[in-house]
Amino acid sequence: MKVQPSVKKICEKCKVIRRHGRVMVICDNLRHKQRQG
């Protein structure tokens, strides 16, 4: 999980979602998991 000021999709499988008011990226590739913070 990377915590970054701005989250972006890295590949086509990445999905940007909101959980508990946080913007997150989820993907099949676990290296692509990101959270905005």
Curated annotation (Swiss-Prot):
<dbReference type="InterPro" id="IPR000473">
    <property type="entry name" value="Ribosomal_bL36"/>
</dbReference>
<comment type="similarity">
    <text>Belongs to the bacterial ribosomal protein bL36 family.</text>
</comment>
<dbReference type="GO" id="GO:0003735">
    <property type="term" value="F:structural constituent of ribosome"/>
</dbReference>
<dbReference type="GO" id="GO:0005737">
    <property type="term" value="C:cytoplasm"/>
</dbReference>
<dbReference type="GO" id="GO:0005840">
    <property type="term" value="C:ribosome"/>
</dbReference>
<protein>
    <recommendedName>
        <fullName>Large ribosomal subunit protein bL36</fullName>
    </recommendedName>
</protein>
<keyword id="KW-0687">Ribonucleoprotein</keyword>
<dbReference type="Pfam" id="PF00444">
    <property type="entry name" value="Ribosomal_L36"/>
</dbReference>
<dbReference type="GO" id="GO:0006412">
    <property type="term" value="P:translation"/>
</dbReference>
<dbReference type="GO" id="GO:1990904">
    <property type="term" value="C:ribonucleoprotein complex"/>
</dbReference>
<keyword id="KW-0689">Ribosomal protein</keyword>
<dbReference type="InterPro" id="IPR035977">
    <property type="entry name" value="Ribosomal_bL36_sp"/>
</dbReference>
